[in-house]
Amino acid sequence: MKTKLKPISFCGAFLMLAAIGANAQSYNWISSTEGDVWQQAKISLQSKPTGTVDLIVNENEKIVTFKAWGTTFNELDWDALGVLTRNEQDEILHNVFSPEGDLRITRGRISMGANDYARSWYSCDEVEGDFELRYFNINRDKQAIIPFIRAAQKYNPELTFWISPWSPPSWMKIHGDYPVLSSKYNNLSPQLDYLLYGNIGGKTDPDEMKLTGERNGKFPRQLATTDYMIQDPRYLQTYANSFCKFIDAYKEQGIPIDMVIYQNEAYSYTPYPGCAWTAEGTIRFNKEYLGPTLKRLHPEVKLYLGTFNTNRQDHVEKIIADKELQAYISGMAFQWEGREVLPSIRQQHPEWDYICSESECGWGSFDWKAGEHTFELMNHYLGNGCKEYTFWNFILTDNGESPWGWKQNALIRVDSKARTFTYTPEYYAVKHYAHYIGAGTEVIAYKPEGEDKKPVLVVRTPEGKWVVMVGNFQDTEQSLTLQIGKRYLNATLAPHSMHTFEMR
């Protein structure tokens, strides 16, 4: 059954710890626990702390100025939305995209060609040897992705977009197929799996797959030694040209693209559309082909490096150390395991912008624990200076299964048999942030989740309002004490709860 979003009265699950001073600054307190979401109360700052101070907010410091929340426009999301009535679709699109809605998303990610939540494999040009791109087209996009975007634009005409491919056209790859590795979900011959490591090791390691296995703290456990994109200049230039063709084609559809990333997750060796790249191949393509081509044909479009889903810092540093490449780069994009190296990379290159290019999508559980994880991810990425945060699927049917056999979570879950929908715990986790943090909001202070499982983020809106996002992901109550100026925010947080405190 659909979970309604109407505010309801505060029911006593959360306890204020100190008497409220008559002249104290008042805050709205929004809290959520499993089965009892979006409770509202009021709380005021105090003159004294009632516990150990968790975080001291220095209003003269700033981590980053936030820009945008985003989501990805995938075919399976459009199919899920299509299960519902027009009124239900309108409710969802309003809540997700409208400036007056719940999540207020202003940014869209588009896959250039198929990704793992496409209906099936496709690219914009599967005509082998078409180096002039005469047969390049976005016909498949016109079936679902573009109608999906237009439906969102109805609620926010100012949406902007960025692109990244999962795989080049199959004929541009060394084995002539869209996946990296064989599986029962594709037709690639297992005999070609050895290409990933060339003559090193002989066989692929099943634990390299994101879907399964232990990785001993490293992802990937073994880096690919082979570029799956053919490294011949003619192929590389044609591929760079295809990015510009895609930008042009979407512009004709009234969809502005202002940022490009050369590859999604070059370090996931996948049975679905993917492409492994070495550090040398990544540098070569971005520095010698994609960067110069964008600068010449689309100087208004920024080039970011990513999407980095590896925690191998030495590998990332090797790529970004290239001085000629740096001349083309405006920022970096991190997701999944890449979150681990974000803080140190940002410290090395404070001149670049940073984004979370994909929120982690779980395994189809759609449970409260998944909501807590997403809450912590937003704390981590914003607290470590990301200006944008992009979600993956925002709506899926049933168990969220991909055509390539794995399950993922979404912000909204559709029951395809009953033709009903539910706002999931992750939806509310996102609302605790996105409803209050918009463009121009300054991220001021941050405390990571840590052993106490109590992540805290403090921001200041363009109107000068303080907003605090905090979670308690322990099995017991925890106290919260923040120092803001000369006063204190004191509260008791219920077990496994999410909170937003907004200055009134």
Where are these regions (language model features)?
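Carbohydrate-binding surface patches
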Residues: 447-485, 492, 496
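Bacterial Sec-dependent N-terminal signal peptides
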Residues: 1-26
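Solvent-exposed loop/turn segments at secondary-structure junctions
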Residues: 74-79, 114-117, 167-171, 264-269, ...
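N-terminal catalytic cores of secreted or lumenal carbohydrate-active enzymes
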Residues: 34-257
